[in-house]
């Protein structure tokens, strides 16, 4: 059997991971390393080469959309349906399991998942029965407490009150709420996975049945798993299982990087220890001391990214390290772009634009205006140039190399109304028969970009796009421009009554987004960024949402951007409290120690004179320990590292 098509277009590291022998495997994916392709091709490899039945494969993603896309790509690669495979989100798979085994799970056959009104009604009855005042015991805060315990896999009997009367009462409410739900034969969203875990844990024959059936368990974004998700996966695979998990690689700075301390002195990052105080940005350019809570180091062999600013400031990091960088009107010089644009239902295309354009109703960066005009879903900056002609030459050559169209997704207005690109039917005839995904992935991998991390996600009125906007240091508790506690903000706009209902089920308070119109907004702040990201993760799974991460480092916020995604002409924030322009990007290959710090509350520090983010795992509410725990649970697991081409 010829299976060369399963490895075609993959680099050596990707091929090794895809064609790895049967056994536990941990794939650490760097920026722009093509991890999604590896998962898709691995499933196809298991079926066509290893002879695995689709019925024996369970694959987990974090959104329904990602699951649907993966299924579609697997079917395209194999040329056959993949319906027998279990592919979905953690909660979606748990729900499916409970529907099949409702009796063993202690549920009625027609059990319901609580909507917002029913959940609030049950909780209010519980509070009334316990003679508790709702103004003191706020339902939505109680629900977040209950959900947090379930995410840890904890029932009321497992939780310690630590001598805290408030916590003791919350545990009592949790117990009464749980009993009320059981009597009513209903479950909330967080209950699905915990109940599915207990179903297997308490029924060894059933667990063995599924262990025998699902010999192949694949997991995407493994670094984002929480406690109950990890427990559920490990229970299913068992010590003899064959898990194939993909997670993000470490994000670190090179040895010798000079970190600005609280007193203004500079010290090499390798000399800093937990408890030291560094200078940090509390938001809006408010630089103050912040405590280092953790230090991290590891050996690194591979490429490092050197970002050079016009002022001479330089920061050297792994390609995966997160910085704050973007295009800001005013500080950003005129720059010309070659971009890759994606529109759902159409595919990918190439185009050119520039920072400053004429005739705008309101000023915005050129590629943002183009994305808005074409109702695009995502956009990546492939390369930047100093002249329009250079960007257009790049567009033509790249289009020919990768077979990507340069035609617009929507008809152009203005001159030549009868021209080719002014007719929607002509444009549909171009894009409909094309499968541009593979070409787009090849291009993005070549330039070190990740298909899951676009430079721009349009804020759209289209209800199919649900952006979860998260702003580090977006607010401050204390009410003064300088001083106070940094608060981190999350906001989500619900464009339909269905979305609104989903958010309300989670206990989120909605308000009208505008005086007129049919949209609603949820917005809140938290001092703990990990807690905020836990909320964001829950919203993402329920709404198939996507993160838009920003840091409010000066008067204008900058996106979270990996070092591999930084482009010339972007601006970053330097220690003088101003924007500075990225002049050039260089790469170097080396074997060295790399380091990172975790900064209390603010999660940023100054490295090489540039404000940068600290380790991504430590702040987003996931359990970085799960990656280390996996290595302990599967000591024979083979490690594969995917790095940028």
Predicted regions span which residues?
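A short beta-strand-to-loop transition that corresponds to the Sensor-1 phosphate-sensing loop
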Residues: 43, 61-64, 90-91, 246-250, ...
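Conserved coupling/interface region of RecA-like P-loop/ASCE motor cores
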Residues: 125, 251-252, 389-396, 616-645
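HINT superfamily self-processing domains
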Residues: 252-614
């Amino acid at each position: 059997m010829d299976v060369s098509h399963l490895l075609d277009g993959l680099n050596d590291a990707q091929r090794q991971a895809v064609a790895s022998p049967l056994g536990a495997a941990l794939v650490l994916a760097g920026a722009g390393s093509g991890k999604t392709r590896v998962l898709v091709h691995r499933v196809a490899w298991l079926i066509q080469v290893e002879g695995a039945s689709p019925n024996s494969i369970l694959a987990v993603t974090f959104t329904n959309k990602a699951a649907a896309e993966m299924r579609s790509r697997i079917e395209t690669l194999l040329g056959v349906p993949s319906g027998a495979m279990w592919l979905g989100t953690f909660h979606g798979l748990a729900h499916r399991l409970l529907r099949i085994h409702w009796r063993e799970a202690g549920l009625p056959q027609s059990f319901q998942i609580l909507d917002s009104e029913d959940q609030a009604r049950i909780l209010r009855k519980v509070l009334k029965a316990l003679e508790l005042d709702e103004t003191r015991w706020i339902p939505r805060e109680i629900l977040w407490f209950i959900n947090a315990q379930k995410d840890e896999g904890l029932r009321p009997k497992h939780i310690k009150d630590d001598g805290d009367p408030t916590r003791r009462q919350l545990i009592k409410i949790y117990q009464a709420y749980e009993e009320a739900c059981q009597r009513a034969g209903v479950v909330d969203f967080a209950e699905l996975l915990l109940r599915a875990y207990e179903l297997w844990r308490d029924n060894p024959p059933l667990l063995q049945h599924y262990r025998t059936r699902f010999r192949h368990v694949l997991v995407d974004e493994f670094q984002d798993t929480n406690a109950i998700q990890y427990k559920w996966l490990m229970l299913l695979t068992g010590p003899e299982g064959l898990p194939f998990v993909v997670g993000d690689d470490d994000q670190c700075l090179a040895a010798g990087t000079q970190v600005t301390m609280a007193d203004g002195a500079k010290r090499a990052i390798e000399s800093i220890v937990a408890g030291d105080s560094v200078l940090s940005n509390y938001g809006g350019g408010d630089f103050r001391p912040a405590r280092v809570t953790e230090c991290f180091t590891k050996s690194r062999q591979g490429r490092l990214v050197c970002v050079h600013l016009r002022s001479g400031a330089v920061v050297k990091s792994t390609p995966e390290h997160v910085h704050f960088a973007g295009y800001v009107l005013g500080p950003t010089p005129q720059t010309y772009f070659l971009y890759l644009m994606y529109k759902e239902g159409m595919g990918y295309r190439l185009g050119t634009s520039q920072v400053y354009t004429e005739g705008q109703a309101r000023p915005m960066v050129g590629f943002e205006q183009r994305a808005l005009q074409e109702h695009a879903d995502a956009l990546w900056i492939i390369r930047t140039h100093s002249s329009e002609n250079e960007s257009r030459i790049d567009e033509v050559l790249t289009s020919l190399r990768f077979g990507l169209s340069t035609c617009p997704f929507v008809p152009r207005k203005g001159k030549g109304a009868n021209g080719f690109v002014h007719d929607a039917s002509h444009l549909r005839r171009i894009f409909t028969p094309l499968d541009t995904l593979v070409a787009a992935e090849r291009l993005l991998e070549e330039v070190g970009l990740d298909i899951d991390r676009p430079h721009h996600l349009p804020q759209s009125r289209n209800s199919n796009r649900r952006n979860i906007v998260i702003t580090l240091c977006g607010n401050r508790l204390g009410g003064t421009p300088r001083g106070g506690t940094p608060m981190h903000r999350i906001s989500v706009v619900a464009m339909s009554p269905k979305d609104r209902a989903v958010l309300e089920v989670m206990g989120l308070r909605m308000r009208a987004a505008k005086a007129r119109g049919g949209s609603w907004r949820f917005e809140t702040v938290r001092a703990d960024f990990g807690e905020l990201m836990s909320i964001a993760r829950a919203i993402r799974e329920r709404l198939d949402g996507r993160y838009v991460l920003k840091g409010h480092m000066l008067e204008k916020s900058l996106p979270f951007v990996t070092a591999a995604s930084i482009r010339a002409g972007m601006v970053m924030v330097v220690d003088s409290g101003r924007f500075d322009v990225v002049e050039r990007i260089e790469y170097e290959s080396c074997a060295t120690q790399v380091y990172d710090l975790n900064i209390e509350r603010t999660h940023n520090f100054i490295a090489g004179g540039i404000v940068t983010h600290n380790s991504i795992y430590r702040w987003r509410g996931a359990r970085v320990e799960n990656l280390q725990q996996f290595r302990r649970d599967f000591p024979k697991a083979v490690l594969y590292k995917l790095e940028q081409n």
